Amino acid sequence: MRFRSDSRADHQHPKKQGSMDPDTIQALKYQDRSSSSSSNNKPKEKVGSASTSPSPTLFASNDSVKVEIGVGSSDKEKPDVKVSFFTIFRYASKRQLLINLFGTGMAIAAGAAQPLMNIFIGKIATVFLHFTSAIRSGDLDAIRAAHSDVYSTINSDALILLYLGIGMFFASMLYMAVFSYTSERIASNIKYAYLSSLFSKPIDFFEQCGQGTVAAKIGSDVHLIQIGIGEKLPMAIMYFSTFVTAAAVAFAFSWRLSLVLLPIAPLILLAGGVMGALTKGCKLVELDCIAKAASRAEEAFNAIKILKAFSKERTIGQEYDTLTTDTKAAGAKAGRIQGVGVGALLFIIYAGYALAFFYGAQLIARGELLPGRIVSVVFANFAGAFAIANLFSMIENFTMATAAASSVIGTIQQDLASSELSESRRNEEKSQTSRQLATGYNAELKLDHVHFAYPSKPERPVLKDLSLTIPSCVTTAIVGLSGSGKSTIFALLQRFYAPTRGSIRLDDVDISALDVDWLRGQIGVVEQQPTLFAMSIQANIELGLPNRHTRSAEELESLVVQAAKKANAHNFITALTHGYQTEVGSQGFLLSGGQKQRIAIARALIRDPKILLLDEATSALDSKSEAVVQAALDEAAKDRTTIIISHRLSTVRNADNIVVLGPDGIIEQGSHHELSIKPNGTFASMLRHQDDKTKPVMVTSEPEIVDSSHSLCLTEIPTMEIAHSLEVSRTISALADSVKPKDPSKNFEPPGESYASPAADGVKQDAPKTDSVGLRTLLHILIKDPETGRLAQLYMLGSLCAAIIGAVYPVYAILFGTAIEDYAPCNSSDGRPCPNPARGTMLHNNRISSGSFFIVAVGCAFISFYHVRSLYIAGSRVTHRLRVLVFQSLLCLDASFFDDPVNTSNDLASSLSVLSQGIYGGVGPTLGSIVQSLATVIVGYAVAIGYGWRLALVVIASTPLTITAGLLRLRVLARKESKTKQAHQHTTQQACESIGAIRTVSAFNLQPQTLQVYQKNLENASRSLRPTMCYSSVLFGLSQCVQLLVTALAFWYGGRELAQGHTSSKGFFTILISVVYGSVQAGNIFNYSADFSSAHSAACKSLSILKQAKEVVAEAQANDRDVQWNTEDSLPSGQIALKEVTFRYPQRPTCTVLDRLSLTIEPGTFCAIVGGSGSGKSTVLQLIERFYTPESGRVLLDGYSITEGDPARFRKYMSYVPQEPTLFQGTIGWNIALGATDENPEDVPLAKIQQAAELAQLGDLLASLPEGLNTQLSARGVQMSGGQKQRIAIARAMIRDPRVLLLDEATSALDPASERAVQGALDNVSQGRTTIAVAHRLSTIAKADKVIVMQAGKVVEEGSPRELFQRDGLFALMARLQGVSF
């Protein structure tokens, strides 16, 4: 989620949170009225309950927009909502509907132009046939009269056709411009409504709906909707208008013949309807697979370092392949359905022509119809039938749009449907109660017999009949084992969930009756894993302040600085180049964990809440920062109700009330003193096993260590300052001056050969260059890929059949011209029956022509089936394989690629769908349509030249007009495609970011501002596309009117050729149909220009990604070499060395993180790395794991440079446990097995998984779960507590029995009992292996063989814990601040 980095502009002119543009408000009001039976037109607030999920109020009063996270049941309890194609237009405003109505009129007018042209074709045909009859009769007077009629008719009618062409240009241009504009606005309205709807979902909904799913729906699904209601819908209206007008013309000229041909259109529509209905099911399956795969992809990109650490890129890539495999089957099934449908369509059309010519001949023979009129009727039916065929070809677009709408709008409509239950009464009660608590309430909280189980696991209660009173204005600490329900209490207090039974009361008022926004506005929250947004530090802190838009910029700045000082963040912020205006990046990745935590604390403190919830608020801080921040929190806790969740009992020493939770409820409760002196008390036992051995040190100012490591660039590294403490009188700055980094030359020199470190091999972040042959090259690669099957054969068969279908059209032209000339002997102007023997000859020839048409109809039916089926299957295989290849290639790229702000996990997951969807337009059925059109043009031109080269060349010479217009439009569409993606990439990322941080968004009532900014960004994106829309519409109009202009030219010049004897009526009509309508097919090629533009763009981008991945792999293979470990078991001993390493993060090239760092860690030893937040500790681990490559220097394992060769060769001997545990959706056992060296987690023996679980002390947790290791984890493992997730992550690391174990605060999230057990397990498993632990809590490194103290990217102290403590230097100061002695 992105907000304005500098919010001062808004402060000068405060805006209401709910302000929107009129179109959006009207559209959302309209769809709300259409979906709700309530007659109350006033804005409605929502309240969550235990049984329903409130719907979003998408527009509001003058004060605010009310949107909440629901607390009710999941979607299973919501009513099913049917979504049709026309449901999409509920999200159009009245103004947009009126504009669409105008555009519809223009499309109807454009569609009527071609059938009206047939009136004049029939008139000219009568004159031409009359001239032919006169020539055959030899009557000079008749010849002169017919000659004069030819000239007179072609001059007047050609001019009329010219006027029709000009009118069609303006009509086509206007309808395309109108629908391009309104489709963009409606799509924006749907995106806005969808995000608003997600904000009203119960929190358990997001356990299954990840950011990848949101990206797929907003990016891909809404794009499908926009295509359906944009360019495709007005063209469908135009084709339908063509059909209706053509039918009217046909009936006007011969109702008998038209009546016989009348069933053709219903049969076409019936075939199309059945095909569309059957295809929709296939598309729904495909979209569902893509959404699930997108969620998995987003998960993988978010945890890319975990995947690389355990070399599981291939495993996740194969799983992604499996998740998307069903798209191939769905595509094949859709291909068979479409093949049968299109074959039936062509059979109906050509068999209809056979019937028309056969029955028309009977009417002519009886004198009931003139040959010229039959030409008008047949041409009109020809135009109408092919209009229906073109309309038929768009059914897929409308089917996909409807399927996408069912997915997106269905989600919105479910919430609207479930918001009708007594909302007025609930609103009234809620508002009254909130007013009673608005002034002077005590903030006492009571949990009364609360029973709760998460909706995803209803059989496993977390809280069982819990009764607890939390007194007002005191500090209550909740401690206990991981999974005992501590964090669940916080979720219930914020109304993320509702108790299954019992109640939670605030001053004796059930919180379910309170305005949820008001309630959350009274609470300040600091989470264990802080969430920051891609905005400035100041803007992030401001988010915690209610009514911030009503305050001046000066007041806001003052409050932000005060809050930052309280949170011990002011010094490091002011040291940054841009200070408080520094952008923190997506999810705050530009800051260290401790820096993010302090900003989160400042965000909570700035609102001066009545209730303060602290969930391990200092877990990510170093010892000095923790001491100061803890003192600040103790001060902030005064005169407010504060609840602390903590595993570190030293942080709850000053709590007034301590509650010890167990699996079955409260074990004991009391003050710290009371509980600590209980002889057999649980708390006393926990306290005895904590390593806090001395009293805490009082700190009155900030012991900050600030440097440039893993954080933003500093203007300078400030001298560290600390006030006098009880035991420390010297300053840290003095210590920093007295402690010098060790001489690198004195470090241990590892055995083995030394290798020069290569330059950094990170992937360049420059925009990919366009490949001029992108689509062709990509197809060549995929055709050779064995995973795509017999792709070449499918394309050959599909293209050959498409070419045959295209060649049928000129054959039809020959048959048509022959049949028309055969009518010439019976061309009577007085309506007399045709005399013999001309009648017998005409009927005989007609039977041959009609039979030929029927044979063509049967052949087309079979050939078109194979044409469509083959290309559908080929397109599905190509898009599936491309999606998998791009995903696997992205996983191969360096970690630095994913640090780039433009390569967020949401954008990358969304791009997989966008690229595959784009490529489908050039490799699926569209490719067959283009081959078909080209065959029609080539064969048609050849036939025309054979029948009359003079007329053919003149008409063919006009073809460049069509081609030029199409090419220009192609270029504009390519530019539009690029601009559209660029414009909406930011909005998609914002939506995904807000959903990924849904708890934070909800806790701080950020939904109104999120929606306001999102809606503004959507408007800006739409506005930037308008010029491109205009250019494209003008060129589209030109391409559409060319047909009429060329037809006018053909009649004018053809008439003269006929009059001068250079051609016959048969030759004229053969040339007319072959060339003029061949030119139309040439124009139709460019109707697919948008599809090919998207395909070409997608191919170029895909090739760029594949090329980058190939280069990374090739470089690794080129530098790879056999490694011979100098040990008995042929395994590395585990010696780690960094030699003169200098490193800067690729995204911060001006900031030195490690400055010529040298250190050596002996094999089999336990080495701890400590230091202030951002001193470079975690960076050392990431270099050892080869996530990054040093700028200079070497990183060695047993003397071998790990920066050379395949990183997996070295990583298989290492295990990595990050500070913030990352789990995947899947079973607990699968997550643990992911760390094994086996290629497939499914192949890991159960005993091995169980052994790793025992080492990580997971036995009790697994025993409490009905399914044990088979328990399914949701996305990111959100139903597990932080400690439980961390233990699973430790088990994942231990299962591979590593030679080098890397721990980044591995036990920071554990409760005391779990920490003690896991620490003991880590101590045991560290025997015989090299263990490197980054730690803030010095009690966890008491058994370390060696401690390295880092500052500003250098080693400042080194030795055993006891040696460093006795040295009374920086380490000793850190230990005393934590109350630890060695």
Swiss-Prot record:
Keyword Glycoprotein attached: yes
ABC transmembrane type-1 domain span: 101-400, 797-1094
ABC transporter domain boundaries: 445-688, 1136-1377
Basic and acidic residues: compositionally biased ranges: 1-12
Localization per Swiss-Prot or TrEMBL: Cell membrane
Gene Ontology molecular function: ABC-type transporter activity; ATP binding; ATP hydrolysis activity; ATPase-coupled transmembrane transporter activity
Membrane topology: Multi-pass membrane protein
InterPro entries the UniProt entry points to: AAA+_ATPase, ABC1_TM_dom, ABC1_TM_sf, ABC_transporter-like_ATP-bd, ABC_transporter-like_CS, P-loop_NTPase, Type_1_exporter
Keywords: ATP-binding, Cell membrane, Glycoprotein, Membrane, Nucleotide-binding, Repeat, Transmembrane, Transmembrane helix, Transport
Ranges that cross the membrane: 101-121, 159-179, 233-253, 259-279, 339-359, 374-394, 800-820, 848-868, 911-931, 951-973, 1034-1054, 1067-1087
Keyword Membrane: yes
Location of region: Disordered: 1-56, 738-768
Gene Ontology cellular-component annotations: membrane; plasma membrane
Induction: Expression is strongly induced under conditions of nitrogen starvation. Expression is positively regulated by the cluster-specific transcription factor rua1 that recognizes and binds to the specific 5'-T/G-G/T-C-G-C-A-T-A/T-C/T-C/T-G/A-3' upstream activating sequence found in all promoters of the UA biosynthesis genes.
GO biological process: transmembrane transport
Superkingdom as given in the UniProt entry: Eukaryota
Protein residues bound to ATP: 480-487, 1171-1178
Residues the record marks as carrying a glycan: N62, N397, N680, N827, N903, N1020, N1324
Job of this protein: ABC-type transporter; part of the gene cluster that mediates the biosynthesis of the glycolipid biosurfactant ustilagic acid (UA). UA is a secreted cellobiose glycolipid that is toxic for many microorganisms and confers biocontrol activity to U.maydis. Export of UA is presumably catalyzed by the ABC transporter atr1. Atr1 appears to be quite unspecific, as many of the UA derivatives produced by cluster mutant strains are readily exported.
PANTHER family, sorted: ATP-BINDING CASSETTE TRANSPORTER (PTHR43394:SF11), ATP-DEPENDENT PERMEASE MDL1, MITOCHONDRIAL (PTHR43394)
Family listed: Belongs to the ABC transporter superfamily. ABCB family. Multidrug resistance exporter (TC 3.A.1.201) subfamily.
Protein name: ABC-type transporter atr1
Gene that this sequence comes from: atr1
